[in-house]
């Protein structure tokens, strides 16, 4: 944490820096481990607006603290020139904005859906896809109308993928739903009569 504060930083500065770090870690946790939440389309613009407002507000508040000398910059950053400080500020603003969008658009709505949502079932036409590469969420996933989300990936095992036809087929999704979106809890092949 020395990059966030000096040994003489105030308790408020330490608290705010810790809250920002936890906010960033929450978004990183979602990106790495959770991909089963499909947000409602109406949630996109409000979550983006909240994310931009939050990241901009926090950045302006920290800048104001730096200019008033109530926020003491760490020793590593105090030697930077104006160009490096500006680039670092823009990078921090983008990172905080992206993390805020993940948290307000995916992580918090997913948590609320888990707590207040109700169980439901839906069927959909999907295809399976094999993922290649070192950095992937899972080896096999489903593609359907709901998988259009940037951070949505419903994983299936190799046996499900190999048994699936190459064209679109019908699946039954067990979900937990709320007005914010739905969480895909389980996937099973729909009965033959639902296949098209």
Predicted regions and their residues:
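Cytosolic juxtamembrane N-terminal segments of multi-pass membrane proteins
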Residues: 1-12
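Membrane-embedded alpha-helical segments of integral membrane proteins
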Residues: 11-71
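Internal/C-terminal transmembrane anchor helices
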Residues: 77-107
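Structural detector for short beta-strands of small beta-barrel domains
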Residues: 114-135
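Short aromatic-glycine-enriched beta-strand elements
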Residues: 132-145
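A short macromolecule-binding patch
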Residues: 148-154
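Short nucleic-acid-contacting surface segments enriched for D/E, G, S/T with interspersed K/R
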Residues: 156-174
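OB-fold/S1-family single-stranded nucleic acid-binding modules
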Residues: 176-196
